[in-house]
Amino acid sequence: MKLIKIIITLFILQLAQGCSEPAGPSNSGVYLLLDTSGTYTKELTNALKLVNVLLVKLEPSDSLAVARIDTGSFSEKDIVAKTTFNDRPSEANKQKRHFREAMDNFVKEVKPSKYTDITGGVLQAAEYLNEKNTGRKTILIYSDLKEELPDGYVRDIPFQLEGFDIVALNVTKLRSVNIDPREYMDRLEDWQRRVEEGGGSWRVINDMDRLERIING
């Protein structure tokens, strides 16, 4: 529940920030990337709770998309569900119901992926939100951030993330971290560097007891 409260706080802060900026699109776009590799599929039930919170908090004209991270994630085929909420409450409620159904079915049927193309997922997320032209753009990455690519895949590509808020969620420590903790630290630092070099903002919501300070800092 703490994670859910913090996500709500994050959106309140974004709304407050938007009020002080020059006039422009005021709607929000959120793209959630879900890691489906190995045993991480067991974490998807918690991710489903996050989706339910987003469905409650997002408003008319806001956009929401959820996609899986798998072998080649720079593709619309990995989008599990997407929608832009209608101005009419009755239509918006239908959209939310269909979105929940799609997510429920996905969590029940998903099979673990051998590879994790996180970079491709971020590129696809940025492309999607840019096309939606939302005032606020947020990419949530529910993953351990360990990228593993099949032979031949090229992902040494600079991000273009100006105006994007990138939030890494539930970044679990792998077993190998017990042997060398630097692996975990280097993984986070590398992703932060790539995002910030691309003009985006980066934060990690991981330590539940310190989440509020992370967001406000």
Show the residue positions of the predicted features.
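Sec-dependent signal peptide recognition
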Residues: 2-9
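C-terminal motif of bacterial Sec signal peptides marking the signal peptidase cleavage site
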Residues: 15-18
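Von Willebrand factor
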Residues: 26-136, 138-140, 172-174, 208-212
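Exposed acidic/Ser/Thr-rich ligand/metal-binding surfaces
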Residues: 28, 112-163
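VWA/integrin I-like adhesion module and closely mimicked acidic/polar interface patches used
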Residues: 146-190
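Von Willebrand factor A/integrin I-like adhesion domains
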Residues: 181-217
